[in-house]
UniProtKB/Swiss-Prot annotation:
The keyword Ribosomal protein applies. The gene is rplT. One of its GO terms (cellular component) is ribosome. One of its GO terms (biological process) is ribosomal large subunit assembly. Transmembrane segments: none annotated. SUPFAM superfamilies: Ribosomal protein L20. This is Large ribosomal subunit protein bL20. InterPro entries: Ribosomal_bL20 (IPR005813), RIBOSOMAL_L20_CS (IPR049946), Ribosomal_protein_bL20_C (IPR035566). It comes from the Bacteria. Binds directly to 23S ribosomal RNA and is necessary for the in vitro assembly process of the 50S ribosomal subunit. It is not involved in the protein synthesizing functions of that subunit. It holds the Pfam family Ribosomal_L20.
Amino acid sequence: MARVKRGVIARARHKKILKQAKGYYGARSRVYRVAFQAVIKAGQYAYRDRRQRKRQFRQLWIARINAAARQNGISYSKFINGLKKASVEIDRKILADIAVFDKVAFSALVEKAKAALA
């Protein structure tokens, strides 16, 4: 029976993992066994954090809108409720952007929300 030599395949697999672990600290970028574990864990973190990123940005937008709304004398929840009643359909990402970069326009939106609540 012919002898099966698999050195090329194993080396290619190791090279692939070590390439993915490039930039990691110490043995995590040099030793295959440690690098493999680090790459697997990094993948798990990346998968989890792609979902968490969406939540975190929404939290950030809400915090910015709340701060700007309170400067205009209304709470976040009342502001959003007023916008819904005034049938203003602007998502939180754009509202946060307006709150940071265009305070005059945001104040106009607050007045519109207050009018809808009254």
